[in-house]
């Protein structure tokens, strides 16, 4: 189906024909733990990876399989792996690349959970990271060490929607024989396909825009199929014979899909961050309307940004669509159809004013999720990024008067009216 447009692919890939057992047009929920083998030889072939197919529910499920094929197609990859959460997708990706003793060069303005994983958790497992200003290409390149195993970016940084130059950093990564990993949670494949700009691996918290309705946890890893895992000798887990599969080399056995196959066959098998069939089904419901929702998110965001940019109680708006934003040129290059519906602004005042504004909102929900059809709000410094020191917060552009918004799909007049009455509440409390 590679010749079809995005809007068609999001509806059909992975289930081009009705379900063969029931003729169901909707993707069924295959709520099972395990699968019957035809005979002993068939079972042995499945377990030995000689025959592709379902083995056990921790590894694969037919509902999950449709989701994986659909996201892989939308991102332009060769294969994907759906997992229980976005955190699992990021963790497995980093562990598969760095192993014990590896090093990651990471953009410093990333999701707080990813920052904590790289800065505090993974060092206990022998994996270290250097955080860099992704706008400074020399700093990115100079951070590469002999044990570096990947460069890690977000298409739109969290929470400020800053944008790295993916093409330029991909060139640096590949010149050093490193894969470029990009978290495209905020970008989505509808707005940007990082693989087309040189990314080798794309990860998602499917909980966000892919699901879109705040109901379902999930994560996705997409393999571009373009990285040569054998060339540098730095990725033995993927390229060399694996003792737990009788000497199978994933790079040799499955070729372009080696990376996600390794994670499925080893990390997922042994540590079990499995997505449930029902969650895979719910995420598929979200995928089917992804383009429609993103258009409305982008349309509403454009109007909210314009409103905030001229509001007398706003100190600063961090949105790359604004001409004065340092990433405006990159925004026009990588996001020609708009986007960045999760962004921050600084209210005049400090934490007291920020909290009063947030607590006065009526349509916006105060919660930790983003990219819901409902508009959301949070105070990053005391919640999502509260584990960071004051110095780390400042380094990521987060102050005590910074407020993160996730613009939903409600009517724009109601969204702006809610923001305005919250500003009035702040003024009345002075």
Question: Which functions belong to the PLM regions below?
Answer:
Residues 39-91, 113-120:
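Conserved N-terminal alpha-helix of the aminotransferase class I/II PLP-enzyme fold
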Residues 1-61, 69-70, 403:
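N-terminal "arm"/small-domain region of PLP-dependent enzymes with the aminotransferase-like
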Residues 271-274, 278-280, 285, 289, ...:
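Conserved small-domain helix->loop->beta segment predominantly found in fold-type I
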Residues 2, 14, 18, 80-309:
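Conserved PLP-enzyme active-site core in the AAT-like
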Residues 222, 344-346, 406-408:
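Short hydrophobic/aromatic beta-strand micro-patches
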Residues 119, 128, 146, 293, ...:
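PLP-dependent enzyme catalytic core of the Aspartate aminotransferase-like
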Residues 156, 185-187, 322, 348, ...:
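Active-site beta-loop-alpha junctions enriched in small/polar residues
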